[in-house]
């Protein structure tokens, strides 16, 4: 695998650190007036999802992580595992519920997700960036109730809760950004 200097660290790069794969979320190169330059790096441990902040000297380097991002279709959940299938080879990958984590609330049947594999084992699941879900529960918007931000919580068909505008009603289908869990628009 390729070796990356700390100067080459960019968001999205996956590296091996302390024997495990990490994804770099942000990297700030600092060149003090006195002393050696360094990179202040925020990264996420792919096996557990925990975030770590680390300082690397400008002479430090890290090996690229041998991870593969593959597009897999979500099939079903049997309680302990979420099952995904490769669309071309039809190979199935069971993924533990703790690995799926918060992504579970955005999973729809046959949704194409990005699953990160390390040594053939799924370690991360990213749902599609946008999903269309039906609202199953929300308060009715009262006429003239527009003071403040004008939002109300709504429960979606998968159990996720997002803040929506007052005019959105139960039974409507909305588009949601899964990265920020925010309402985008109504679907006609």
UniProtKB/Swiss-Prot annotation:
UniProt xrefs under PROSITE patterns: EFP
Posttranslational modification: May be beta-lysylated on the epsilon-amino group of Lys-34 by the combined action of EpmA and EpmB, and then hydroxylated on the C5 position of the same residue by EpmC (if this protein is present). Lysylation is critical for the stimulatory effect of EF-P on peptide-bond formation. The lysylation moiety may extend toward the peptidyltransferase center and stabilize the terminal 3-CCA end of the tRNA. Hydroxylation of the C5 position on Lys-34 may allow additional potential stabilizing hydrogen-bond interactions with the P-tRNA.
Record GO cellular component, one term: cytoplasm
Keywords from the UniProt entry: Cytoplasm, Elongation factor, Hydroxylation, Protein biosynthesis
Localization terms from the record: Cytoplasm
Transmembrane segments: none
A Pfam entry, by short name: Elong-fact-P_C
N6-(3,6-diaminohexanoyl)-5-hydroxylysine carried by residues: 34
Main location: cytoplasm
One biological process term in Gene Ontology: peptide biosynthetic process
MF (Gene Ontology): translation elongation factor activity
NCBIfam families in the cross-refs: efp (TIGR00038), PRK00529.1 (NF001810)
Function statement: Involved in peptide bond synthesis. Alleviates ribosome stalling that occurs when 3 or more consecutive Pro residues or the sequence PPG is present in a protein, possibly by augmenting the peptidyl transferase activity of the ribosome. Modification of Lys-34 is required for alleviation.
Family stated for the protein in its record: Belongs to the elongation factor P family.
Entry protein name: Elongation factor P
Source organism of the structure: Erwinia tasmaniensis (strain DSM 17950 / CFBP 7177 / CIP 109463 / NCPPB 4357 / Et1/99)
């Amino acid at each position: 695998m390729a070796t990356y200097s700390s100067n080459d660290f960019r968001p999205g790069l996956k590296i091996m650190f302390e024997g495990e794969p990490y994804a770099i979320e942000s990297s700030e190169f600092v060149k003090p007036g006195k002393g050696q330059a360094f990179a202040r790096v925020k990264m996420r441990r792919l096996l557990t999802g925990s975030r770590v902040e680390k300082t690397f000297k400008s002479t430090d380097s890290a090996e690229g992580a041998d991870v593969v991002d593959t597009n897999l279709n979500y099939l079903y959940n049997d309680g302990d595992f979420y099952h995904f299938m490769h669309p071309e080879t039809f190979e199935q990958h069971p993924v533990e519920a703790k690995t799926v984590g918060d992504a579970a609330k955005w999973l729809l049947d046959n949704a194409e997700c990005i699953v990160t594999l390390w040594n053939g084992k799924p370690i991360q699941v990213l749902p599609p960036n946008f999903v269309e879900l039906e609202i199953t529960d929300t308060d009715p918007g009262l006429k003239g109730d527009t003071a403040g931000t004008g939002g109300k919580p709504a429960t979606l068909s998968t159990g996720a809760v997002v803040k929506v505008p007052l005019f959105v009603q139960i039974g409507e289908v909305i588009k949601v950004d899964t990265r920020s869990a925010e309402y985008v628009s109504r679907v006609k």
